[in-house]
Swiss-Prot record:
This is Polyadenylate-binding protein, cytoplasmic and nuclear. It is found in: Cytoplasm; Nucleus. The keyword Cytoplasm applies. InterPro entries: Nucleotide-bd_a/b_plait_sf, PABP-dom, PABP_1234, PABP_HYD_C, PABP_RRM1, RBD_domain_sf, RRM2_I_PABPs, RRM_dom. Residues 42-120, 130-207, 223-300, 326-454 form the RRM domain. One of its GO terms (cellular component) is nucleus.
Amino acid sequence: MSAETSTTPAPAENTNGTPDNAPAPEVTAVEAPATTSQPHSASLYVGELDPSVTEAMLYELFSSIGQVASIRVCRDAVTRRSLGYAYVNYNDTAHGERALDELNYTLIKGKPCRIMWSQRDPALRKTGQGNVFIKNLDSAIDNKALHDTFAAFGNILSCKVAQDEFGVSKGYGFVHYETAEAANNAIKHVNGMLLNDKKVFVGHHISKKDRQSKFEEMKANFTNIYIKNIDPEVEDEEFRKLFEKFGEITSATLSRDSEGKSRGFGFVNFSTHESAQAAVEEMNDKEVRSQKLYVGRAQKKHEREEELRKQYEAARMEKASKYQGVNLYVKNLTDDVDDDKLRELFGPYGTITSAKVMRDTAPVETATPESETKESANKENEKAAEGEKEPAAEEKEKEEKKEAEQKPEKKPLGKSKGFGFVCFSSPDEASKAVTEMNQRMVNGKPLYVALAQRKDVRRSQLEASIQARNNIRQQQAAAAAGMGQAYMAPAVFYGPGQQGFIPGAQRGGMFPPQPGMMMGMPGRPGQYPGPFPGQQGGRGVGPNQQIPPNFQGLPMGAMQGPGIPNGMGYPMVQGQFGGGRGRGQVPGMGGPMRGGYGGGRGGVPLGGQMRPGQGGRGQAVGQPGPETPVGVLTAQALSAAPPQQQKQMLGEALYPKIQATQPELAGKITGMLLEMDNTELLGLLEDDEALRAKVDEALSVYDEYMKNKSDEPAAEKPKEAAQEAPAEENKA
């Protein structure tokens, strides 16, 4: 391959080699000498990758050609799932050319990769010059076979066969040539040829925008009409005579099944659009043999599906807007609250259009009647076998009719799920109900009342909160390693000797953090993210550090990593507090840390009470101070605390309950639940069933997130594991 190859525009990355714009008439104006536009670093686009392919796998493959500058697998910003393509940068352009020649269509994880030059200029990427469209391809033809077929007509920049989600060919593909002359030559020689015994069509690629405008023009000048609700007795000749009066007919046919019977619909194609339009206007809704006909423009299947999809979306949006701000979600209901009781509770606040308590679908009480019905049916069958067939059959039919009539009236009610919905006639009434009924005690339980949300909206909010915390962990890790955020945002793999870092290692030759090790986190006002940064020589807390007053209430499980035995969690913090000269009292740090640094678990002490700083001025850190009272967290106690302290108090109360059922993920789940309102969290503390339901919902979201994240490089996992517990559980 010549050096001139890299100067040509490549297709847009997001179209995977299928640019949308129409082809340019000539290519001579774009071509330039290789010496003027040749980049110093050769960048390759690698597509058609399996989602599990990582930077390390690509480095192992592409480093066999030459020295790799960097590799980046592009991932979704939220889920971090691979988008199926990557960029490989060489320092030497010759290495890029060699990789393009030797590694194109190489199997990676069982899938052939597709390599082409990367073109950052979107204007050059989307010119569409030299792009050829091929359809009616045999399913056995893949990217490599298509490339080998069309390579004889010129230099190919990109070649792709369209596939569905299962990797099966859709029967069409694209070949992007370097020049328009090569594309014209391929169209001239291959169009109409047989490939694997199938005649293929080859032509210039037309952009979607141009195709859409052409399609709209065809719709406005239609000649083919569709007729349905035709009587099955109507014959072809009679069907044709119905429409002959409107103009010249080129074809008219009735659709029939395999036995030759009419299926009740047909098509008529006129020679002019005016004739077809007149037939639609006059024959639509006209009765023929006592059946009202439907006559309209003939549509393709994909067009009908698109219209149905738009109608469904419009109906869904209309329904969502109709109930926006008027539908309330009510939970923490007792089992004795039914639909009527729920309507009675919310009736004073406005006109209620519907009120429903959600219940289990399979009540236990119905098991006995069903078994009795089966036994009686068996007895009737036995009697029928003895000669009482007709009376038994009549009685059985009567009983079935009675049961069918009674079912709508006596629908069995299952056990209440503890929540329901109330829909008002106006948003003002709904807002008033939320204000008055939220946290109101009903049958000894505080209600939670809020505007109802769809399940997908709630799930997206949880996923967004998970992603936000993941970004915070990355930023904290970058700050701890002495790097800016720009190094952590894109996951880039750098080759040996290149600028940057290898995943799992940090700058300055530091080893990656191991699970159980405590990492320094950047301090922010009102937060205590990790070991106190800014402390030097054990001189106590720096002047700009702020520690929540009730920090001593953090559970030990949230502070101790899997690699640290009980009683030895974070000795560095002890040293910073116990040694050196203390600079006055730290608010809320007096006395032993209950469940935190002050004492270990399992009978292993952490050294008891913190020793005061020797030679320090003012009150020592280890002297007794005010503590948060031990007991059940109440709404009054929560409201009395400062706003920045309320979440931590809730986290301290939630963590032991969650740890009892999910000890490994207690910190993560607690952090996820703390995104909820404080009033709702208070309800969870009092209702174990509701708490379990929320924990299960958070687990399902977290499991799905981890599945999507399972394709990340293995080298990054130890580093991430070391950061997960401190970042998530300190927040609790």
